[in-house]
Every structure is written in C-alpha cells, then in structure tokens.
C-alpha cells in the first residue's frame, strides 16, 4: 500500500500537453457569459433608450448576479484543473488508493471521461491492461480520440483501450475484469436505477476481483446504502466498505 501511495504521489498528469478537460466545462461558462451579455444589454437599453427604470434595475441585478456566478465558476474550474488547483487529480488519487489491486490482469474504468483515471491506473500498475468506457455526451467535450491521445502522451497507449459504452448495459461477458473503478458517474445517468447500475458494473468483475466506486451515495438515489452494502456481503462479496472521501480531497 505504501509503495502504491509513493507511486501515486510521483504521477502528475498533463505535463506533456495532454488535454484532460475539466468538470466545469466550457459550455457552462459560455452559457453564463452569454446570459450576462444579454442581461447587461437589456439593462443598458432599458435605462438609456426606453427609460424603463424597473426593467433596467431588474436586468442590472440579474447581470451582477451572473457576473458573480461566472467568477465563481471560473474559480471552480481553476480548482479542478490539472496543473491548477488539482482537485480532479486528488479525487482520482483517492479513488485508486482504495483499490486493493495487485496490478495483474484487466481493469475497467466505467465512465472514463477524458481518460485521466484510466491512464493514472495504467501508470500505477505497469502490468495491467486498462479499458475505459464512456457514453461521451456533449456536456463535457470528452471523447474517445481525446482519451487515446492522452494515453499516447503519457506513454501508456499500448495498455489502454477506450470504447463507447453504456453503464446500463456493459458490452462485456460476466467476470471479464480483475478490477473495476468508476468515479462520479452513476448519479449523472438520468432515470436509471442506481443500484442496478452498480450491479451491472459488478457483473463484469471476476470472483476474487476488487472494485472502488465513487459517487454521490445519496438516499434519494441509492436508498439505504448500508442496507445495500449488506446485501452485497450476503451475495458473497467478501469486503464491502462505505467510505466518506469528502475530507480526503
């Protein structure tokens, strides 16, 4: 465990020009910026052209609020960024620190995004073959080509493969992987039974395999998570732990 922590501490992604994107995506900033311009224009026109004081005041308040929101989102983006505040990297570090993997065999990353977690796993465990799957919707600007370029830049392209996939129905046979990871994915899948998503992920895990799945384990999404953890133990999973990682990142 100490050796793995040492390896993790030595890994810094994105130092060769790789693009890992950001959880605070550009479309969000562009949308807020666009609304700011519109409300600012309305405030100006209402005041100087139409002389509608109430509308001008309301639009000005909206514009100031949007400006503050844009500044906050920009700060959050900086905190998340690789090479910035490093929040994304710290989260990935924490998730993999709980994966008791010997580094031999196949590892699956469900919802790989820009490939950062998959690539970090490949760097930590040089004998592992890593597969990353994602639906790659438009919200974050991630994609398969981005993942493959990042893996090549970090020198692990030969051991990483990325493919389009759906966490609801993984396109792999039962017991295909020795380790499974996922970070902050399931809560984003609308109208899905979150427990069913976890069970689909665990379906492809080999007997004796290990997993580390990080998500918002809110009762409205997962129900009683302690009860669910016990159900997994009753099904034969030898060690199931619920860990609050909020203080670790």
Residue ranges and their predicted role:
Residues 86-104:
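Conserved alpha-helix/loop element of class I SAM-dependent methyltransferases that forms part
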Residues 125, 189-191, 205-207:
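Helix-to-beta-strand junctions that scaffold the AdoMet/dcAdoMet cofactor pocket
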Residues 208-215:
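Conserved beta-strand signature within the Rossmann-like core of class I S-adenosyl-L-methionine
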């Amino acid at each position: 465990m100490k050796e793995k922590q040492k390896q993790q501490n030595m890994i810094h992604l994105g130092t060769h020009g790789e693009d890992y994107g950001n959880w605070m995506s550009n479309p969000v900033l562009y949308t807020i910026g666009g609304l700011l311009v519109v409300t600012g224009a309305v405030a100006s026109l209402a005041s100087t052209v139409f002389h509608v004081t109430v509308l001008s005041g309301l639009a000005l308040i909206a514009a100031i609020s949007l400006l503050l929101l844009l500044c906050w989102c920009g700060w959050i983006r900086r905190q998340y960024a690789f090479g910035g505040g490093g929040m994304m990297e710290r989260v990935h570090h924490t998730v993999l620190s709980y994966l008791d993997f010997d580094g031999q065999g196949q590892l699956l990353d469900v919802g790989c995004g820009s490939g950062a977690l998959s690539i970090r796993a490949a760097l930590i465990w040089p004998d592992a073959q890593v597969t990353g799957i994602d639906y790659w919707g438009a919200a974050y600007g991630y994609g398969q080509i981005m993942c493959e370029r990042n893996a090549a830049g970090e020198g692990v392209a030969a051991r990483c493969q990325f493919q389009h996939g759906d966490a609801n129905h993984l396109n792999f046979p039962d017991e295909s992987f020795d380790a499974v990871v996922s970070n902050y994915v399931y809560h984003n899948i609308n109208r899905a039974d979150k427990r069913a998503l976890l069970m689909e992920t665990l379906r492809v895990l080999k007997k004796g395999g290990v997993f580390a799945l990080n998500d918002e384990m809110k009762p409205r999404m997962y129900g009683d998570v302690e009860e669910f953890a016990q159900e997994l133990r009753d099904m034969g999973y030898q060690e199931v732990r619920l860990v609050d990682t909020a203080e670790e990142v």
